Amino acid sequence: MNTPAVRFAARTVRVKAPGKINVSLDVGPRRPDGYHSVASVYLAVSLYEEVAATSTETPGITVSLSPDSTLDLDAVDIPLDASNLAYRAAAIMADVSEHATGVHLEITKRVPVAGGMGGGSADAAATLLACDALWNSGLSREELAHLAAELGADVPFSLLGGTAVGLGVGDQLSPALAKAKTHWVLVTADFGLSTPEVFRTLDRLREAEGVDADEPTGVDPNILAALRGGDADALSRILVNDLQRASIELAPSLRDTLGIGESHGAIAGIVSGSGPTVALLADDSVAAEALAEDLQHQGLSALAVHGPVPGARIISDTLL
């Protein structure tokens, strides 16, 4: 008697993970290993990447970009091979999962590419969580965070979300109990900046000025207090990003963007991380929406967001 073949049941787990802005970023000197120690306050904001992980009968990992992406996919260079962070995240999960199958990853891109907001890191965090669920790996959040750190400094934060202090190269995270909302307008650029190049430029500027940077040991407690209280006015006076001048050196138009934002009602502005995304702080949600609309009329790509928001989370789990 023939045993009926077992039909493969495909399943899709969809996860969303937030982009981030650096509310503060202190950068130490270049270390012998080429990296820089940092002290940063990360804020997860309401601009999300989505990854749909679908099990496949065919072994291996494939990646595609969703037509629902809000980015112009023709204008950005996103690898779909093993160099993609989401691909690498799936490969790491396959190595530690007893029931791994083939998987197809469809990524919905909304966070600017090479924009200083950790879009690729959000893809990786979403993929870790999606594959953990898809393959019933049963890893704890702590175990997932350990794998996330192997992929890049920003990946653990996208998994965690909320507000956090990052030390080391940004991967040593301590959650900050700052849940009050702040409102921002993100002005995105039609170009990217290479994070290593921005750090090299900062080193060059410091060397030319004879500046010996100190190793950062912590963040300004006033920033955390302002975030805990949702005090935009206090926060506006203490935003800091050591990389900002290097980003402006490479892309002088960022100085104009900051100026235009503040002239149209932003109470402060900062380049996020290595840029080129500019984060403009607004008094409240109404002011943020009005500012975004004004900047759009100026021909800029601007959208209102808020933070903090939760980290990567499953939004659907479907048998096909």
UniProtKB/Swiss-Prot annotation:
Any one Gene Ontology molecular-function term assigned to this protein's record: 4-(cytidine 5'-diphospho)-2-C-methyl-D-erythritol kinase activity
Disulfide-linked positions: none
Reactions listed under catalytic activity: 4-CDP-2-C-methyl-D-erythritol + ATP = 4-CDP-2-C-methyl-D-erythritol 2-phosphate + ADP + H(+)
SUPFAM superfamilies per the UniProt record, alphabetical: GHMP Kinase, C-terminal domain (SSF55060), Ribosomal protein S5 domain 2-like (SSF54211)
Enzyme's top EC category: transferase
Keyword Nucleotide-binding: yes
InterPro entries in alphabetical order: GHMP_kinase_C_dom, GHMP_kinase_C_sf, GHMP_kinase_N_dom, IspE, Ribosomal_Su5_D2-typ_SF, Ribsml_uS5_D2-typ_fold_subgr
Keywords associated with the record: ATP-binding, Isoprene biosynthesis, Kinase, Nucleotide-binding, Transferase
Gene Ontology process terms (BP): isopentenyl diphosphate biosynthetic process, methylerythritol 4-phosphate pathway; terpenoid biosynthetic process
HAMAP family listed in its UniProt record: IspE (MF_00061)
Protein name (record): 4-diphosphocytidyl-2-C-methyl-D-erythritol kinase
UniProt organism field: Pseudarthrobacter chlorophenolicus (strain ATCC 700700 / DSM 12829 / CIP 107037 / JCM 12360 / KCTC 9906 / NCIMB 13794 / A6) (Arthrobacter chlorophenolicus)
Lineage: Bacteria, Bacillati, Actinomycetota, Actinomycetes, Micrococcales
Gene name linked to the record: ispE
